[in-house]
C-alpha cells in the first residue's frame, strides 16, 4: 500500500473511531466471505464491520485517543464500529460467534472505556436501551397511578369518616340525652 493510501486509510479509521460510541475487535480467521456478509447483515444498520490492517488501525486508534486496544492488534483483525445501540451489536456478534466458532471476540472500547471479551459478552446479555427505557417509563407510570389513587382516596375517605361521625353523634344525641322534663304544675 502506498504511503498516501496508508495516510488516507488511517484518517478514515480515525474518523470511524471518533464517530462511533463503541468498537469491537474480533479475529475472523477461518470465516468465509459469505459468513462475513452474514455477520455484517446480523449487525444491522448501526454498525459497520471492517477487516483492517493492525498497524494502521493501531495508529488510527491512538490518534482518536484510544490507546487501550494496543494489545488486541495481533492476528487477522476486524473491527465492528458501532454508532447506535452497542447492546444490539454485541448481541449480534455474540450470537454469530456461537454459530461460527471461528469468530473470536478479542475486546473493544465503549465510550472511551476498554472492554474485555467477557465484558462485551455481558453487555450482550443486557436488554436494549429502548426496552430498558420502556420498563423505566412503565415503572414511573405505575407509581404515578398509585399516587393518584391514594390522593383520590384520601378526600373520599375523609368525607365517609365525617359522615359516619355525624350519624353516630345524631344517634347518641337522640337516644343518649334525657328527654326534657315536663314542668311541674
UniProtKB/Swiss-Prot annotation:
InterPro entries recorded: Ribosomal_uL10 (IPR001790), Ribosomal_uL10-like_sf (IPR043141), Ribosomal_uL10_bac (IPR022973), Ribosomal_uL10_bac_type (IPR047865), Ribosomal_uL10_CS_bac (IPR002363)
UniProt keywords, alphabetically: Ribonucleoprotein, Ribosomal protein, RNA-binding, rRNA-binding
GO molecular function, one term: structural constituent of ribosome
Any Gene Ontology biological process: translation
Statement: the UniProt record of this protein carries the keyword Ribosomal protein: yes
Superkingdom of this protein's organism: Bacteria
Region (Disordered): 165-185
Alphabetical list of Gene3D superfamilies matching this protein: 3.30.70.1730, 6.10.250.290
SUPFAM superfamilies, per database record: Ribosomal protein L10-like
The keyword Transmembrane is assigned to this record: no
One GO term describing the cellular component: large ribosomal subunit
Protein family (similarity comment): Belongs to the universal ribosomal protein uL10 family.
Function statement: Forms part of the ribosomal stalk, playing a central role in the interaction of the ribosome with GTP-bound translation factors.
NCBIfam families reported for this sequence: PRK00099.1-1
HAMAP family: Ribosomal_uL10 (MF_00362)
Complex and partners: Part of the ribosomal stalk of the 50S ribosomal subunit. The N-terminus interacts with L11 and the large rRNA to form the base of the stalk. The C-terminus forms an elongated spine to which L12 dimers bind in a sequential fashion forming a multimeric L10(L12)X complex.
Protein name, UniProt field: Large ribosomal subunit protein uL10
Gene designation per UniProt: rplJ
Amino acid at each position: 500500500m502506498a504511503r498516501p493510501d496508508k495516510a488516507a486509510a488511517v484518517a478514515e479509521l480515525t474518523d470511524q473511531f471518533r464517530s462511533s460510541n463503541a468498537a469491537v475487535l474480533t479475529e475472523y480467521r477461518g470465516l468465509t466471505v459469505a459468513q462475513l456478509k452474514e455477520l455484517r447483515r446480523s449487525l444491522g444498520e448501526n454498525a459497520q464491520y471492517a477487516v483492517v490492517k493492525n498497524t494502521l488501525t493501531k495508529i488510527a486508534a491512538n490518534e482518536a485517543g484510544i490507546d487501550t486496544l494496543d494489545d488486541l492488534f495481533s492476528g487477522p483483525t476486524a473491527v465492528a464500529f458501532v454508532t447506535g445501540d452497542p447492546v444490539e451489536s454485541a448481541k449480534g456478534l455474540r450470537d454469530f460467534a456461537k454459530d461460527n466458532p471461528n469468530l473470536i471476540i478479542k475486546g473493544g472500547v465503549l465510550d472511551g472505556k476498554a472492554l474485555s471479551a467477557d465484558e462485551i459478552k455481558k453487555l450482550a446479555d443486557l436488554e436494549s436501551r429502548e426496552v430498558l427505557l420502556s420498563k423505566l417509563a412503565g415503572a414511573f407510570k405505575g407509581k404515578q397511578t398509585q399516587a393518584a389513587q391514594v390522593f383520590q382516596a384520601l378526600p373520599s375517605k375523609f368525607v365517609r369518616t365525617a359522615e359516619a361521625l355525624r350519624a353516630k353523634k345524631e344517634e347518641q344525641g337522640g337516644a343518649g340525652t334525657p328527654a326534657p322534663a315536663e314542668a311541674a304544675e
